[in-house]
From Swiss-Prot:
Residues 1-40 are annotated as: Disordered. The gene is UBA3. ATP binds at residues 475, 501, 512, 525, 573-574. This is Ubiquitin-activating enzyme E1 3. Keywords: ATP-binding, Ligase, Nucleotide-binding, Repeat, Ubl conjugation pathway. Residues 59-608 are annotated as: 2 approximate repeats. SUPFAM superfamilies: Activating enzymes of the ubiquitin-like proteins. Belongs to the ubiquitin-activating E1 family. Sequence repeats lie at residues 59-197, 456-608. The active site is at residue 629. GO terms for molecular function: ATP binding; ubiquitin activating enzyme activity.
Length: 1053
């Protein structure tokens, strides 16, 4: 099952940030340290602008643990570079990179920090300065001497990517027995094969096994039974599972359950469950109650490496079509270590002698493996392993860099469940379908030698000549550009990589979009990313555009552009953009490589012409929206309160000022539009404009404070008093049931107090933003709560009396809360007349300033007001309040995101890219993947083939388009279908009907050219660059059965 298509990475939109120290030229970057010494730093405050998307995944406590963690990464091949990059972006306290080897041309295939100028330098020393650029808040140092156990004691976690087994045993023994234990990770990438081993010590506590919020339920009833049956409201399915622990709160009647004691769930069902508790003698349940899952820490006992090698236990599977693969790869990696020990090198690519020697070693180890002995050794697989074992391929490094980077985060924080303990992966399906000759695998002393040693020079040439389109240059886009540059995609004069993104760089982008720096803020994402990718590989032939890929830009991304493409890679952050790109790839029959992330989760989907279904073939169910009446009158969770708060913010500060300006800009036109509408919504708009220009008009900052204070009274006191007057606590429905039954919560009016800091904070943010919208000067004392209190306490607040007959919407299906009145037209006329008078009292040229919600600026008071609105409303309804950061996540609709899942997703996509560019791969070679690094879980599956439709001997899928050549008349087109045994009874172009055999007058069109009818009827203007007209045709066969045929293109030019 693929994850939701909604969440995704943001390539062309709202992205993560980085901040802290300025890192522009002259910002005083730290110099790389030549050796690892003790690193000390004062406790850091979390830069919430920088880490907002990461905070949404990890939370503050995990981030604080990361900020206190020192990590060693040993082995700066491509994998080591990826791991170090992800840790620097995550924001650990320090990263020490270690290597004793020097840079060779071979390394440039996998390590994006290196260039040809670095050849001959120490690998760690060559990387340290560029690694430091990623995050100045992380202390980066290089260690270039031989590593000993004494070096390890200062680290919380150590990672090795280039170490022999004997040395790994020595270091792991030291880390395993150290007090406290040092988390040890060993990972290797050998061609298209990879491994990870984790040892976090004899006892390691996982504080949060999955990172999900505790599941909750709203109780509808509880039985007095043994065991007790709890039924919940049927608004949402329960997520509890048997064995979960839950606690109860707010239960009326059966108050014994409110003791905070965790109780075990049994017989979990969609809307009910039982608990291991005898409630026979408890009080009778009356109403209310919330049940909440208790997440308990989990203690894991890791084995040391030398013990785990002989008894690896159950190994996590990534691909269920390779159920027997883990023990095979466990043997292969052991054989490789022995081969390197015997020969001092890896097996040579395509060398039969080395492959034979490798097989002999593997057979000997297997014979000595006792009860773990394999029945047979897959010689073909072992030869493939040996041949590519020296190569650290960039896609594999990116994928494993994401996995290992996440394991380090787990080791340092206890957040998420670690690997237990081995993980193996291979992608041999990425190899070309044709045989690879030894001559084709030989190095030629260029930066692609490692990749050539696996795939051969023929595929390398095809990759360099590929015409590639990357849509979006955010987090996914940056990773893709790095990967493509290292792989050599579009890196010849015959190839071209086009990247487009209409977004600019913001501070909140930088913590995952690693090609950007502080000094790039405000610049176009695509051009900065393209420049950075060209620095990684100067041969990259890239064109950066700032156009959104959408119907409005089809003159830019025209037919000729699309027809020349070899592959399209999506790096988008919203479903609508994905659907559009899917439609275009279907139309032009181009492969689409799709991916997305949501926190620690990621998914990739391959859309291959004629082999797989398209992206749009499977749609997620629409997100459940809370009914309008729930949000506005009956909230029962903080999400409802925040939805209401954002709606009020936009109404008060953006929509109403825009309405005011529309009226003032052209009163006559505005009045005509309101009269034409003549409904309750028009009346309400005019009422708000009228209030802004008269009763609520602000000329001084004191006016703004007064407005804010009266708004507080209206929102959190008067409205609640009216609601509870209309529906008192003992109110009943028309069926006689209690009106205030779950999930409704009975509200209480708030009494304003200047001694309550949250009340004053609301007044402060509301008055400052009101002043901004009216262009009123904001005094320096506006942020002084004591002076603010003095002003507020002098404001006279009218006494509120609830009214009879007020209509409050309770219908959950209602989509509009406006109440229609027979007097609407008369009221509109009266309001328009008053507005004309109010306008005369304004200064000439007066306009309000609409304020558009911006969540990522903590100095603009937007989130202060929204969180204030939401929390005061939550207080009305006894709903737990949230801090401003949590409010920002929910109200700002922030997509949780981390660098590790992004890196992994792009690595997986690029492993599929090898198959796409090579061509001739069957559908069973491709993989769609869903992964959750938090669990961890990897689920790979073959893509679903497209649905095949048939008529007689003709078959087609969604990928097909019927082409009709020639500038045909309508009669000739109808005959073209008749020749296929089909009757075309209706022909349309866009939304216009060109022909229907039921309409007699349409017979007059039979002699006209189809394109001329389209120009006349549909007002189609076919651009010069397009040679054809697309039409939709409804057909039936001889038996009058409808036949769903593909899109038809008439090539008239």
């Amino acid at each position: 099952m693929l994850p939701s298509k909604r969440p995704s990475d943001a390539a062309a939109g709202d992205e993560n940030g980085r901040g802290g120290d300025a890192r522009g030229p002259g910002s005083g970057r730290r110099r790389a340290r030549a050796a690892a010494g003790a690193v000390t730093a004062a406790p850091q405050e979390i830069d919430e602008d920088l880490h907002s998307r990461q905070l949404a995944v990890y939370g503050r406590e995990t981030m604080r643990r990361l900020f206190a963690s020192d990590v060693l990464v040993s082995g700066l091949n491509g994998l080591g570079a990826e791991i170090a990059k992800n840790l620097a972006l995550a924001g650990v306290k320090s990263v020490t990179i270690h290597d004793v080897k020097t840079v060779k041309m071979w390394d440039l295939s996998g390590n994006f920090f290196l260039s040809e100028d670095d050849i001959g330098k120490n690998r760690a020393a060559a990387c340290v300065a560029k690694l430091q650029e990623l995050n100045n808040a992380v202390l980066i140092s290089a260690l270039t001497e031989e590593l000993t156990t004494e070096h390890l004691s200062k680290f919380q976690a150590v990672v090795f990517t280039d170490i022999d087994l004997d040395k790994a045993y020595e270091f792991d023994d030291y880390c395993h027995n150290h007090q406290p234990p040092i988390s040890f990770i060993k990972s290797e990438v050998c061609g298209l094969f990879g491994s990870v081993f984790c040892d976090f010590g004899p006892k390691f506590t996982v504080l949060d096994v999955d990172g999900e919020d505790p599941h909750t339920g709203i109780i509808a009833s509880i039985s007095n039974d043994n065991p007790a049956l709890i039924s919940c409201v049927d608004d949402e399915r329960l997520e509890f599972q048997d064995g979960d622990l839950v606690v109860f709160s707010e239960v009326h009647g059966m108050t014994e359950l409110n003791d905070g004691k965790p109780r075990k769930v049994k017989n979990a069902r969609p809307f009910s469950f039982s608990i291991e508790e005898d409630t026979s003698n408890f009080g009778i349940y009356v109403k209310g109650g919330i049940v909440t899952q208790v997440k308990e820490p989990k203690v894991l006992c890791f084995k040391a490496l030398r013990d785990a090698m002989t008894d690896p236990g159950e190994v996590l599977l990534s691909d269920f079509s390779k159920f027997e693969r883990p023990p095979v790869l466990h043997l292969a990696f052991q054989a490789l270590d022995k081969f390197k020990k015997d020969h001092g090198r890896c097996p040579a690519a395509g060398c039969e002698e080395d492959a034979h020697s490798f097989l002999k070693i593997a057979a000997a180890i297997n014979e000595a493996s006792a009860d773990r002995k394999l029945d047979t050794i897959d010689e073909k697989l072992f030869r493939q392993f040996a041949s590519g074992s020296r190569a650290v391929l960039n896609p594999m490094a990116a994928m494993f860099g994401g996995i290992v980077g996440q394991e380090v985060v787990k080791a340092c924080s206890g957040k998420f469940h670690p690997l237990n303990q081995f993980f193996y992966f291979d992608s041999v399906e990425s190899l070309p379908t044709y045989p690879l000759e030894p001559q084709d695998l030989k190095p030629s002393n260029n930066r692609y030698d490692a990749q050539v040693s696996v795939f051969g020079s023929k595929l390398q040439k095809k990759m360099e000549e590929a015409n590639t389109f990357v849509v979006g240059s955010g987090a996914l886009g940056c990773e893709f550009l790095k990967n493509l540059a290292l792989m050599g995609v579009s890196c010849s004069s015959k190839g071209k990589l086009t990247i487009t993104d209409d977004d600019i760089i913001e501070k909140s982008n930088l913590s995952r979009q690693f090609l950007f720096r502080d000094w790039n803020i405000g610049q176009a994402k695509s051009t900065v990313a393209a420049t950075a990718a060209s620095a990684i590989n100067p041969s990259l032939h890239i064109d950066a555009l700032q156009n959104r890929a959408c119907p409005d830009t089809e003159n830019v991304f025209h037919d000729t552009f699309w027809e020349g493409l070899d592959v399209v890679i999506n790096a988008l952050d919203n479903v609508n953009a994905r659907m559009y790109m899917d439609m275009r790839c279907l139309y032009f029959q181009k492969p689409l490589l799709e991916s997305g992330t949501l926190g620690a989760k990621c998914n990739i989907q391959m859309v291959i012409p004629h082999l797989t279904e398209n992206y749009g073939a499977s749609r997620d169910p629409p997100e459940k929206q809370a009914p309008m009446c729930t949000v506005h009158s009956f909230p029962h969770n903080i999400d409802h309160c925040l939805t209401w708060a954002r709606s009020e913010f936009e109404g008060l500060l953006e929509k109403t000022p825009n309405e005011v300006n529309s009226f003032l800009s052209n009163p006559a036109q505005y009045a005509a539009a309101m009269r034409k509408a003549g409904d309750a919504q028009a009346r309400e708009l005019l009422e708000r404009v009228s209030e802004c220009l008269n009763k609520d008009r602000c000329s001084t900052f004191d006016d703004c404070i007064s407005w804010a204070r009266l708004k507080f009274e209206d929102y959190f006191s008067n409205r609640v008093k009216q609601l509870t007057f209309t529906f008192p606590e003992d109110a009943a429905t028309s069926m006689g049931a209690p009106f205030w039954s779950a999930p409704k919560r009975f509200p209480r009016a708030l009494q304003f107090s200047a001694a309550d800091q949250s009340h004053l904070n609301f007044i402060m943010s509301a008055s400052i933003l009101r002043a901004e919208s009216f262009g009123v000067a904001i005094p320096e004392w506006a942020k002084d709560t004591s002076k603010l209190a003095d002003v507020v306490n002098k404001i006279a607040v009218p006494t509120f009396e609830p009214k009879q007959g007020v209509n409050i919407v309770t219908d959950e299906k209602a989509s509009n809360l406006s109440s229609t009145s027979v007097d609407d037209v008369a009221v509109i006329e009266d309001l328009l007349a008053k507005l004309q008078e109010y306008a005369k009292m304004l200064l000439p040229g007066f306009q309000m300033k609409p304020i558009q919600f911006e969540k990522d600026d903590d100095t603009n008071f937007h989130m202060d007001l929204i969180s204030g609105l939401a929390n005061m409303r939550a207080r009305n309804y006894s709903i737990p309040e949230v801090d401003k950061l949590k409010a920002k996540f929910i109200a700002g609709r922030i997509i949780p995101a981390i660098a590790t899942s992004t890196a992994m997703a792009t690595g997986l996509v690029c492993l599929e890219l090898y198959k796409v560019i090579a061509g001739e791969h069957p559908v069973e070679d491709y993989r769609n993947t869903f992964a959750n690094l938090a669990l961890p879980l990897f689920s790979m599956a073959e893509p679903v083939p497209p649905k095949v439709m048939k008529h007689k001997e003709t078959s087609w899928t969604v990928w097909d388009r019927w082409s009709v050549q020639g500038n045909l008349t309508l009669a000739e087109l109808l005959q073209w279908f008749a020749d296929k045994g089909l009757t075309a009874y209706s022909i349309s172009c866009g939304t216009s009907l060109l022909y229907n055999n039921m309409f007699a007058r349409h017979k007059d069109r039979l002699t006209k050219k189809v394109v001329d009818i389209a120009r006349e009827v549909a007002k189609v203007d076919v651009p010069e660059y397009r040679r054809h007209l697309d039409i939709g045709v409804a057909c039936e066969d001889e038996d009058e059965n409808d036949v769903d045929i593909p899109l038809v293109s008439v090539y008239f030019r």
